[in-house]
Amino acid sequence: MDQTNLRRCLATYFGDEKNINHILKKTAGPDQMVQIYQILTTIENPSHSEQDNFRRAVTMVKQNQLGWGHPIFQPEQQKISEENDFITCPYEVSEGVLRCGKCDCTKILWFSKQTRSMDEPTTIFASCSNCKTRWTE
């Protein structure tokens, strides 16, 4: 869809040229059509009132919650962030810090992660490099 048709479509809901330009600026990029479709489907949602839908659509634009920024993708973004952190801070291999309970080896691959509340210590995930036994501490 070209810019003229896109503007015409947005003018149905956002009469002011300033608002249309703002939406086009906020959604600029390769997935612009997907983001505008998301705005329009939010406005046309039959399960809520038109005013509520319009308010939701405006909030999505203002808070950059279009596309991958939408809160529904938050768990997936968290997983990707953890994977990226793993790449920058990989496993540590240490001798003598931990000992395998199965084969008594001291070459252990381990990492720590905060799995409980902040006032609790981090959980250590360990794996023996000799017998591949895994455990947590």
Curated annotation (Swiss-Prot):
GO molecular function, one term: zinc ion binding
Binding site for Zn(2+): 89, 103, 128, 131
GO biological process, alphabetically ordered: DNA-templated transcription
Zinc finger map (TFIIS-type): 85-136
Keyword Zinc included in the entry's annotation: yes
SUPFAM superfamilies in alphabetical order: Zinc beta-ribbon
Keywords tagged on the record: Metal-binding, Zinc, Zinc-finger
Source species, domain of life: Viruses
Protein family per UniProt: Belongs to the IIV-6 349L family.
Name under which the protein is recorded: Putative transcription elongation factor S-II-like protein 055R
Organism for this UniProt entry: Invertebrate iridescent virus 3 (IIV-3)
